[in-house]
Curated annotation (Swiss-Prot):
One of its GO terms (biological process) is translation. Keywords: Ribonucleoprotein, Ribosomal protein, RNA-binding, rRNA-binding. This protein binds specifically to 23S rRNA; its binding is stimulated by other ribosomal proteins, e.g. L4, L17, and L20. It is important during the early stages of 50S assembly. It makes multiple contacts with different domains of the 23S rRNA in the assembled 50S subunit and ribosome. The globular domain of the protein is located near the polypeptide exit tunnel on the outside of the subunit, while an extended beta-hairpin is found that lines the wall of the exit tunnel in the center of the 70S ribosome. It comes from the Bacteria. The keyword Amino-acid biosynthesis does not apply. CDD domains: Ribosomal_L22. Part of the 50S ribosomal subunit. Belongs to the universal ribosomal protein uL22 family. This is Large ribosomal subunit protein uL22. GO terms for molecular function: rRNA binding; structural constituent of ribosome. InterPro entries: Ribosomal_uL22 (IPR001063), Ribosomal_uL22_bac/chlpt-type (IPR005727), Ribosomal_uL22_bac/org-type (IPR047867), Ribosomal_uL22_CS (IPR018260), Ribosomal_uL22_sf (IPR036394). One of its GO terms (cellular component) is cytosolic large ribosomal subunit.
């Protein structure tokens, strides 16, 4: 039994979000929530929200017992990139890349 939750177009770069995703991969949901709660990273807040949604999906849609769930899969894909311009000296301009992410979490029974 598996339950999936996604956060598409999350406003954080995939590189930063993957640092947090790697910390909770394969852990039980209780342990993962504890790790995310005490993490100081912005991505931890986003990943925690998706994990809580996946747990709720498992409980509501599949009738799963929360105590038996673990993070089976978690991955962060690259979303669209907004390109912005920052003016520089002597009429030049630099390109700013505002990256976004698609965060996907699959929880399953142990």
């Amino acid at each position: 039994m598996e339950a999936i939750a996604k956060h598409r177009f999350a406003g954080i770069s995939p590189q930063k979000a993957r640092l947090v995703a790697d910390q909770v991969r394969g852990k039980s949901v209780d342990q993962a929530l504890e790790i995310l709660t005490f993490s100081n990273k912005k991505a931890a807040v986003l990943v925690k929200k998706v994990l809580e949604s996946a747990i709720a999906n498992a409980e509501h849609n599949e009738g799963a017992d929360i105590d038996d769930l673990n993070v089976a899969k978690i991955f962060v894909d690259e979303g669209p990139i907004m390109k912005r311009i920052m003016p520089r000296a002597k009429g030049r301009a630099d390109r700013i890349l505002k990256r976004s992410s698609h965060i996907t979490i699959v929880v399953a029974d142990r």
